[in-house]
Every structure is written in structure tokens, then in C-alpha cells.
């Protein structure tokens, strides 16, 4: 019983370490977390696709958008 409990504790600690490492890599991702590249008709640049959102999130400097139901493509500046 003690060996099984110790093994569960080791697995839990390893999961926490690997999860924290993955979060550090996410900070250096090529695009914003939660957004994927998208294109709208009539726009030359690439936008950020936000899945299952009705509006563009605040704090990213988005100034225009287009809808691809149920998603939204948001454009900065």
C-alpha cells in the first residue's frame, strides 16, 4: 500500500513539473494563446481567429473584425 501511494505521489509531482514547463513554452508561442491565424474577404493581412466568441477580446488592440459563425476573426490596427 505504501509503495502504491509513493508511486502516485511521484507521478503527480512529475505531472506538475511537465505542466509548468509547457506553460513556459506557451509564452514563446508564434501566435497568441487561444488564437489561430485567419483571413477575411477584402483584408490583405492576417487576423486572429477566436473560436466560439461573439466579440473580440479586449487588451489586444483589435480595431476590426469579421464573423465566421460561430467564430470571429479579429484584426489589429
UniProtKB/Swiss-Prot annotation:
Experimental results show no expression in the ectodermal tissue from the distal and proximal tentacles, body wall, and oral disk. Since paralogs are expressed in this tissue, an expression of this toxin in this tissue is probable. The negative results could be explained by the very low abundance of EST sequences. GO terms for cellular component: extracellular region; nematocyst. Pfam families: Defensin_4. Disulfide bonds join 38-73, 40-66, 56-74. Its main location: secreted. GO terms for molecular function: ion channel inhibitor activity; potassium channel regulator activity; toxin activity. InterPro entries: BDS_K_chnl_tox, Myo_ane_neurotoxin_sf. Gene3D superfamilies: Anthopleurin-A. It is found in: Secreted; Nematocyst. The keyword Cytoplasm does not apply. Keywords: Cleavage on pair of basic residues, Disulfide bond, Hypotensive agent, Ion channel impairing toxin, Nematocyst, Neurotoxin, Potassium channel impairing toxin, Secreted, Signal, Toxin, Voltage-gated potassium channel impairing toxin. Residues 20-31 form a propeptide. This is Kappa-actitoxin-Avd4h.
Amino acid at each position: 500500500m505504501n509503495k502504491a501511494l509513493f508511486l502516485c505521489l511521484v507521478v503527480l509531482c512529475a505531472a506538475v513539473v511537465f505542466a509548468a514547463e509547457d506553460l513556459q513554452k506557451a509564452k514563446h508561442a508564434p501566435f497568441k494563446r487561444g488564437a489561430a491565424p485567419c483571413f477575411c474577404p477584402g483584408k490583405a493581412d492576417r487576423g486572429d481567429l477566436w473560436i466560439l466568441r461573439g466579440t473580440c477580446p479586449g487588451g489586444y488592440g483589435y480595431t476590426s473584425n469579421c464573423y465566421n459563425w460561430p467564430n470571429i476573426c479579429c484584426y489589429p490596427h
